[in-house]
Amino acid sequence: AVIFYRSKNPSKILGIKRGDKMKLSTKGKYGLRAMIDLARYSEKEPVSIGSVAARQGISERYLEQLVALLKKAGLVKSIRGASGGYVLEKKPSEISVGDILRALEGSLEPVKCAAFDTTTGEGCMASDGCVTKYVWQKINDSINDTVNQIMLDELIQESKSINPDGECENPKCSQ
């Protein structure tokens, strides 16, 4: 059992290291936007990375890296040829926000002690005797439950309600 003593640093007791933050990187944020865009505009034909990048205001080079991760995860596929581009590998109703974020970010655990992997040694070794592990596991479960329940087709509908005509509102689109 791990016994914690009074500490001037409560973060240490909670298993939080300096720099730990519960927020998504630009990979997750931009990748989710790109997937919504791709789902919306590739219903009839493949979509180029350039057109997604222009509509979303994302660097084409950075978007290529994100699409490579999404392709590796089996969420998108490339179509070769003159009218090629990218399309979804599955129906939007079969792709969750959780699938997308995990493909881009890896684990969504708020802190490493939410899950200790005995095979790799990843996480907090003291987690078995740590009272706060329960808190982090509950938060982790809530995050995963939430992102797994939101499906890409719901976000497409939301996108259409915000911008019904589908016209690009980014000034870079007309360039």
Q: Model-found features: residue ranges?
A:
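C-terminal regulatory/oligomerization modules of transcriptional regulators
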Residues: 3-19, 115-175
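Basic amphipathic alpha-helical segments that dock to polyanions
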Residues: 38, 66-71
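A short alpha-helical element within helix-turn-helix/winged-helix DNA-binding domains
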Residues: 50-56
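Key DNA-contact positions within bacterial/archaeal DNA-binding proteins
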Residues: 61
